[in-house]
Amino acid sequence: AALSLKLFERGQSGSRLTEAGRDLLAEGEKVERAASTFESRAKAHQRGMAGSIRLTCIEILANMAVTPAIAEFRRQHPEVQIDLMVTDQPLDLQAGEADLAVRAVQTLPNSDLIARKIVDYDFALYCSRDYAERMGAPATIADLINHDLIGGDAGLDTVPAMIWMFEQVDGKAPVTRSNSMSNLVHAVRAGMGVAPLPCVVADADSRLVRCSECIESAVSTSYILLRRELKDTPRVRALIDFLVPYMQADMKTRLERGRQMREQQAANDGEPQDLSKFRPPA
């Protein structure tokens, strides 16, 4: 009224918006949405939720579970920005290179970092179907010396399952090395040789053949690590409380899928695979 602008006009069926009214209604809805966003952000700041988190993990975990978990988490908490730093080389959390880390290790480092366990990962030896057709799959520990072995480098060589495999072949040189677990999976798929892989990844891959039972002495455990001063930050707590059960459920689903895949493959091959002769000692 103060602008002498007519927003409604009367018709036979009642009042309706004028062209100016329709235009201003759209603008008013934008203002309402902006005000709602402003209020949500202000409340998020009050709760300590708004802000960013720098999370680091290796590529295979990022692709398998962490990225989907982040996507789901942000649908619930859009005010939290998560910067995912994907590298197979461990970043120094205590030096501030990242806020959180998801790492799979056999033993935790002696540090002031807080650790929360996620899941255990079993490893076994695998080769590709193509490699098995060309070279045969190793049937016993003693057979390993006669096969092409893929090694690790720059940290991957310290994975317990990798150490175990090369201990069985008296220092035989690998045909190639990789510093990435994700790339190691691809190298095995490509038929380059035999290597230890996480069962949760490899069992569900129809291109791979499992050569051994699980290497019981080489179980790795994934943890979320964080600096002690971040433990009471609401957005950090919320992410950890979401990520841990998400990854645990994902692991359970993938293991079941892998079990079904191996059973189906055995049925297709006409006989179950007997790994009893290739059972690494505990």
Where are these regions (language model features)?
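A short LG(V/I)-centered, amphipathic sequence patch enriched
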Residues: 1-17
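Alpha-helical linker/hinge and terminal dimerization helices associated
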Residues: 2, 24-46
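Hydrophobic residues within well-ordered alpha-helices
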Residues: 18-21, 93, 144, 186-191, ...
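C-terminal effector-binding regulatory domain of bacterial HTH transcription factors
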Residues: 26, 199, 204-207, 215-282
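Central regulatory/effector-binding core of bacterial HTH transcription factors
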Residues: 51-111, 257-260, 264
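Short, well-ordered beta-strand segments
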Residues: 54-56, 101, 150, 195, ...
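Acidic, Gly/Pro-rich loop/turn segments at junctions of secondary structure
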Residues: 76, 85-178, 201
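A ligand-binding cleft/hinge motif common to bilobed small-molecule-binding domains
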Residues: 184-209
